[in-house]
């Protein structure tokens, strides 16, 4: 699904292309572009195409577990893709056993010495959000978020926490508006590809919170419908 600025996500990779990318980033002390796949675009030589907007991310806490690389991605600045640079090799199916990075590089290095196993891109880095969210609007949003979580918890029959408890938990971290808090809310609430891309491409903080408000309202309606169906079955 991708990442938002100022948020973190633990990741596991095992494909040679991602291992090469991480090696390059660590050696050069540079970020990588964390971008969701665009479901509407055609494949690029068999590779899933990237979406328009992504987040420059730093890899931290790298460790090996068997054939897997484990690390934490830290989201930083947003970017817009201008041009995709294709991978040196088309996508291939290797089954359960992947070749090494070195073996794959040997197959293209003579013809394409600057090539990489992973997709790259020319990008435009986007500035931080402009504008500020009124305190009353932010308070209303946190209230709505808490209500949404309580409804979801009730449907899942999970913790059984009430609105007052959930609201208190959210208020500990989100009592005052901050861009960091806004992006954290996006990472938690936005699940649809389109709304996540719209948020990443926004210029103003009020655009982002409008996307969040609409998403929560839509989810509340859906969950109310599911709850009514469950009640009718009982």
For each predicted feature, which ranges?
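N-terminal low-complexity, acidic/polar interaction/targeting segments
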Residues: 1-234
């Amino acid at each position: 699904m991708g990442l938002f600025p100022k948020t973190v996500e633990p990741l596991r990779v095992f494909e040679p292309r991602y291992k090469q990318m991480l090696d390059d980033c660590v050696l050069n002390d540079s970020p990588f572009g964390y971008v969701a796949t665009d479901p509407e675009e055609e494949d690029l030589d068999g590779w899933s195409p990237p979406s328009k907007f992504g987040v420059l991310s730093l890899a931290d806490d790298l460790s090996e577990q068997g054939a897997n690389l484990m690390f934490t991605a830290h989201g930083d600045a947003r970017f817009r893709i201008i041009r995709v640079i294709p991978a040196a090799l088309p996508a291939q199916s290797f089954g359960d056993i992947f070749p090494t990075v070195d073996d794959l590089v040997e197959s293209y290095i003579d013809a394409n010495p600057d090539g990489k196993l992973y997709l790259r891109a020319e990008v435009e880095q986007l500035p931080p959000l402009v504008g500020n969210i009124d305190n009353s609007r932010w308070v209303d949003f946190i209230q709505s978020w808490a209500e949404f979580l309580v409804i979801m918890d009730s449907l899942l029959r999970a913790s059984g926490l009430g609105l007052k408890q959930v609201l208190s938990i959210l208020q500990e971290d989100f009592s005052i508006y901050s861009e960091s808090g806004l992006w954290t809310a996006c990472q938690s609430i936005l699940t649809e590809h389109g709304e996540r891309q719209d948020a990443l491409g926004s210029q103003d903080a009020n655009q982002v919170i409008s996307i969040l408000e609409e998403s929560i309202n839509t989810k509340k309606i859906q969950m109310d419908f599911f709850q009514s169906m469950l009640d009718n079955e009982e």
